[in-house]
């Protein structure tokens, strides 16, 4: 029996080692640049306020810290040459872990009694465990306007309150998907007179880093829902802390912590779906809440 047959994960670990070395080069480049800008006071990359807001329909030009993950994405595509397979659909919930199973309660039961079934303080990460065999595959995530609004307003949104987000462009799989969307530049309303051509709201899509279909409502408070494709990626040795779009992600992988024990993911595509009846709560027929209650 060959060594690879004895240890089927050996090839994966060898590939991971190469990814770690490649990522360290990118992190060192970003780290050197940011130390100059921050006086070595923090390992958090702070972007200028002007970058996070539109003024007269334009983005101000600044020499921003380079945290591009394109080399890691190209390496992943080379070593995991899967034809993108959709693993299924998940329905976002602020309080429980998602599941690809079909035998779950309906969306209308989300806030039914007893409320104590929810962990309103420290819910588990939303994304379920994804095996390494699914690296470079995608999953569809459906998010309602109410959940998006709760995150932006920090109301009944424990993952926002706990700032559960690690990394930049590529995030640990226990990062909250809505926080990841916000960290990539997604906003709840279209900027007045603004242009999206410089945004990178789908940074792990190597062919289109702003792969967004549909338009955000111009009228504030107009409800819409999202269908987001998540691309699963290998574990990174380190997830950097970066401040962007009013969200500061957290670092994981410093000397004081162990390597993350799950996969990574990023935003691959976004579909914006405006509701036809703005006053009607989002409870379409067949909308299934796939959740684990244990």
Swiss-Prot record:
Keywords: Acetylation, Chromatin regulator, Nucleus, Repressor, Transcription, Transcription regulation
Keyword check for GTP-binding: no
InterPro entries cross-referenced by the UniProt entry: Rxt3
Any one Gene Ontology BP term: nucleosome assembly
Cystine bridges: none
Compartments, as annotated in UniProt: Nucleus
Record PTM N-acetylserine, positions in chain: 2
Domain of life assignment: Eukaryota
GO cellular component: nucleus; Rpd3L complex; Rpd3L-Expanded complex
Repressor listed as a keyword: yes
Quaternary structure annotation from Swiss-Prot or TrEMBL: Component of the RPD3C(L) complex composed of at least ASH1, CTI6, DEP1, PHO23, RPD3, RXT2, RXT3, SAP30, SDS3, SIN3, UME1 and UME6.
Family from the record: Belongs to the RXT3 family.
General remark: Present with 3060 molecules/cell in log phase SD medium.
Function, in words: Component of the RPD3C(L) histone deacetylase complex (HDAC) responsible for the deacetylation of lysine residues on the N-terminal part of the core histones (H2A, H2B, H3 and H4). Histone deacetylation gives a tag for epigenetic repression and plays an important role in transcriptional regulation, cell cycle progression and developmental events.
Protein name: Transcriptional regulatory protein RXT3
Organism of origin: Saccharomyces cerevisiae (strain ATCC 204508 / S288c)
Gene behind the chain: RXT3
